UniProtKB/Swiss-Prot annotation:
Assigned keywords, A-Z: Bacterial flagellum, Periplasm, Signal
Task of the protein: Assembles around the rod to form the L-ring and probably protects the motor/basal body from shearing forces during rotation.
Principal cellular location given in the protein's record: periplasm
Organism: Sodalis glossinidius (strain morsitans)
Matches recorded under PANTHER family: FLAGELLAR P-RING PERIPLASMIC PROTEIN FLGI (PTHR30381), FLAGELLAR P-RING PROTEIN (PTHR30381:SF0)
Subunit organization: The basal body constitutes a major portion of the flagellar organelle and consists of four rings (L,P,S, and M) mounted on a central rod.
GO terms of molecular function: structural molecule activity
Pfam families given in the database record: FlgI (PF02119)
Name of the protein in question: Flagellar P-ring protein
Signal sequence segment: 1-19
Family: Belongs to the FlgI family.
InterPro entries: Flag_FlgI (IPR001782)
Subcellular location: Periplasm; Bacterial flagellum basal body
GO cellular-component term (any): outer membrane-bounded periplasmic space
Length: 365
C-alpha cells in the first residue's frame, strides 16, 4: 500500500540554497497583535438557540440586558427561549490599531445551541488582559457550515456552532506603543538559528554600515536605527527587504499523532537500514446455532448454543532493505516501499531515529 506523505517542499527536487527577505524570517520586538475576548448574546436564531433550562447563564444575561434597556422582567418568569444563545467573542487587535478601525471577530457558542446560522451578535465589549475595553463587536454572523435533520436523521457539513463577522468590531482604544522612541530595535527570528542570526546581522551591516546590527543570541538581533519616527519607518522598510541567501536548514520530521499526518522538509536524509514491519491480527467471531432433539418425543428441548471461532493471523514481517536517501524523493520512495500506514510509520520513524538511520529532528504533536 502506497503511503501519501505531506512534504513541505513537495515531491519535486528543490535547490539547497534559496533567497528570502528579512521580513519573512524575522519580526520586530513589540510589534505584535493583542488578543481580545468578550461574552455576549446572539439573537434571531431559528429555534436553534440554547435550551434555557440547561444554560441558566443565558437567561441571566438576557435579564440583565433587558434591564439595562429599561425592560422589566417579572421575578420568577420562566423564559423558554430558543432563538437566543450565549457566545464567546474573540478577536486580534493589530499592532498600531487606532480608534475607529474595524477588525474581524470570531463568535463561538458557549451553551447548548445547535446552530448560530442567521443570528445577530448584540453589542459586546472586547477586553484585553488588563480588563480594559479595546473594541465593541456587533453584527450578523456568517456561518460556513450547513446542516439539516428530519425523521431522526441528521446531516451536517462543517461546524454550525461558530462563525465570523468580517469587520464586526470597532476599535475604541489603541494599545500604547513605544515604536517611535529610542534608537534601537530588536529583530526576533521565527526559529532559533545561530548561523541565520549572524547571516542577517552581516547583511544589515553590509547594507547600512559597520556595526549597525549585532546578534545577541540565536533568536535576537540588536539593530541601531535613526532616532526620529519617520526616519525609523523608512529605515525599517528598507531593512526588511534585504535579501538573505539561506543555506541548508535543520532536517525536521513532524508527526501529528491525532491525524496520522507526517510532514518533512527537504533536508531529511535516511541512512541505510533494514526494517521488518508486520501486524498480528486476532479475530474473534461468535455465532449462534439452534440445537434441537432428533426425536419429537424423546424428552429433549430446543436450545441456542453459541459457537466461537478464533483466528490468529500474522501478516507482513518481511525484512526490507532501505538504501540511504540523499533527497526528499528518495526518502519518500523508501518509506512508501515499506507499505506502512501513517500510524505504523510513526513507530518506524522513531525506531529509525533511535538506531541513527534517520538523520533529522523528530517532533511529535
Amino acid at each position: 500500500m502506497m503511503l501519501s506523505l505531506c512534504a513541505i517542499a513537495g515531491l519535486l527536487l528543490a535547490p539547497s540554497i534559496q533567497a528570502e527577505r528579512i521580513r519573512d524570517l524575522t519580526t520586530v520586538l513589540g510589534v505584535r497583535e493583542n488578543a481580545l475576548i468578550g461574552y455576549g448574546l446572539v439573537v434571531g436564531l431559528d429555534g436553534t438557540g440554547d435550551q434555557t433550562t440547561q444554560t441558566p447563564f443565558t437567561t441571566q444575561s438576557l435579564r440583565n440586558m433587558l434591564s439595562q434597556l429599561g425592560v422589566a422582567v417579572p421575578t420568577g418568569t420562566n423564559m423558554q427561549l430558543k432563538n437566543v444563545a450565549a457566545v464567546m467573542v474573540t478577536a486580534k487587535l493589530p499592532a498600531f490599531a487606532r480608534a475607529g478601525q474595524k477588525i474581524d471577530v470570531v463568535v463561538s457558542s458557549l451553551g447548548s445551541a445547535k446552530s448560530l446560522r442567521g443570528g445577530t451578535l448584540l453589542m459586546t465589549p472586547l477586553k484585553g488582559v488588563d480588563n480594559q475595553v479595546y473594541a465593541l463587536a456587533q453584527g450578523n454572523i456568517l456561518v460556513s457550515g450547513s446542516g439539516a435533520q428530519a425523521g431522526g436523521n441528521r446531516v451536517q457539513v462543517n461546524q454550525l456552532n461558530g462563525g465570523r463577522i468580517s469587520g464586526g468590531a470597532i476599535v475604541e482604544r489603541s494599545v500604547p506603543a513605544d515604536f517611535a522612541g529610542g534608537n534601537v530595535i530588536m529583530l526576533q527570528l521565527n526559529n532559533d538559528d545561530f548561523s541565520l542570526a549572524q547571516q542577517i546581522s552581516d547583511a544589515i551591516n553590509r547594507h547600512f554600515g559597520h556595526r549597525s546590527a549585532l546578534p545577541l543570541d540565536s533568536r535576537t538581533i540588536n539593530v541601531a536605527v535613526p532616532p526620529d519616527g519617520p526616519g525609523k519607518v523608512r529605515f525599517l522598510a528598507s531593512l526588511q527587504n534585504i535579501p538573505i541567501t539561506l543555506g541548508p536548514t535543520d532536517a525536521v520530521v513532524v508527526i501529528n499523532s491525532r491525524t496520522g499526518s507526517v510532514v518533512m522538509n527537504r533536508d531529511v536524509v535516511l541512512g541505510s537500514c533494514a526494517v521488518a514491519h508486520g501486524e498480528l491480527t486476532v479475530e474473534v467471531n461468535r455465532t449462534y446455532k439452534v440445537s434441537q432433539p432428533d426425536t419429537p418425543f424423546g424428552g429433549g428441548r430446543t436450545v441456542v448454543v453459541p459457537e466461537t471461532a478464533i483466528n490468529v493471523r500474522n501478516e507482513g514481517g518481511a525484512l526490507q532493505q532501505i538504501d540511504a536517501g540523499a533527497n526528499l524523493n528518495d526518502v519518500v520512495s523508501a518509506l512508501n516501499g515499506i507499505g506502512a500506514t501513517p500510524n505504523d510509520l510513526m513507530a518506524i520513524l522513531q525506531s529509525m531515529q533511535s538506531t541513527g538511520c534517520l538523520n533529522a529532528k523528530l517532533e511529535i504533536n
